[in-house]
UniProtKB/Swiss-Prot annotation:
The modification S-(dipyrrolylmethanemethyl)cysteine is found at C241. It comes from the Bacteria. This is Porphobilinogen deaminase. InterPro entries: HemC (IPR000860), Porphobilin_deaminase_cofac_BS (IPR022419), Porphobilin_deaminase_N (IPR022417), Porphobilinogen_deaminase_C (IPR022418), Porphobilinogen_deaminase_C_sf (IPR036803). It comes from Nitratidesulfovibrio vulgaris (strain ATCC 29579 / DSM 644 / CCUG 34227 / NCIMB 8303 / VKM B-1760 / Hildenborough) (Desulfovibrio vulgaris).
Length: 315
């Protein structure tokens, strides 16, 4: 029987995702493959007292995991796609992108049913500049406060009354079966998600032809098209997942998609949104074209200001 090792972070959500892929592999190749998990701490897991946007560097949640792939101590890695940098280390590639979970965000609150129901000056917790910008574009009166930690930690702080509301990825809440007394899904087009949000990426070495064949069943072409378009947009902006950039692609036919991209300033006062359509064969290039449009329409100036303010490090 063939044995595979999945490298993963140790958070509840990361472990759920790795266990999910483990189960799919062992079911598809029943009696032929068994899978174990190798838990690895990343820089992003260790540095918890600094907002993510200020930690700096690429691959905050993947670098140490990729090192395990390169040194052979793990066969494959399961990542949240929104954490995966645009450029992968030489010798590694994203072999599979499974079917995507809902990419939206969710507002959670103990007392208030929706974003519109929050009182003036309400304290809203999020570690994401993308969420901050879009929240302030809709509600300039809100007091946005940095909130780091795993899903459980953030929910506990909400339940303990430290915040009137918090915003988290819908996919993580659904995967872990978590909720709060009140919640509102903040979905496109009103509120755009991070590039790749809700999708998983299976990374392994390019020279592992055995894994290409064995794991091909995991790849979901519509999800790959959407994610490649979104990642093209982010690459064209030379941005990371900690910058006020959002991208969301949807399939409009068997091989056709539409992508909407957004760049905003930190206060949500200037928001640039543009849309393009494309086909699977040119997904990444259409994302790059959308980035060029957005940059020409003022996003370059906005991003320069964000980096100059020190709110985020240029990737």
């Amino acid at each position: 029987m063939k044995h595979l090792v999945i490298a993963t972070r140790g958070s509840k959500l990361a472990l759920w995702q790795a266990e999910h892929i483990k189960s799919l592999i062992e079911t598809e190749h029943a009696g032929k493959v068994d899978v174990s998990l190798k838990i690895i701490k990343t820089k992003g897991d260790i540095i918890l007292d600094v907002p993510l946007a200020k930690v700096g560097g690429k691959g905050l949640f993947v670098k140490e995991i990729e090192e395990a792939l390169l040194d052979g101590s793990a066969d494959l890695a399961v990542h949240s796609m929104k954490d995966v940098p645009m450029e992968l280390p030489e010798g590694l590639f994203l072999g599979c992108i499974p079917e995507r979970e809902e990419p939206s965000d969710t507002l959670l609150s103990v007392r208030y049913a929706s974003l519109d129901a929050l009182p003036h000056g309400a304290r809203v917790g999020t570690s994401s500049l993308r969420r901050q910008s879009q929240l302030l574009a809709l509600r300039p009166d809100l007091d946005i406060i940095s909130l780091r930690g795993n899903v459980d930690t953030r929910l506990r702080k909400l339940m303990d009354g430290e915040f009137d509301a918090i915003v988290m990825a819908t996919a993580g809440l659904k995967r872990l079966g978590l909720a709060a007394p009140h919640h509102e899904v903040l979905a496109p087009p009103r509120f755009l998600p991070a590039v790749g949000q809700g999708a998983l990426g299976i990374e392994f070495r390019e020279d592992r032809a055995d894994l290409r064949d064995m794991l091909a069943f995991l790849d979901h072409r519509p999800t790959r098209i959407r994610v490649e378009a979104e990642r093209g947009f982010l690459a064209g902006l030379e941005g990371g997942c900690q910058v006020p950039i959002a991208g969301h692609a949807v399939m409009t036919g068997d091989d056709n998609f539409r992508i909407e991209g957004l760049v905003a300033d930190l206060k949500g006062e200037r928001v640039i949104r543009r849309t393009l359509e494309g086909t699977g064969a040119n997904a990444r290039n259409r994302g790059l074209e959308l980035a060029s449009q957005v940059l020409a329409d003022g996003a370059a100036e906005i991003l320069d200001e964000v980096y100059a303010s020190g709110a985020a490090d240029r990737q």
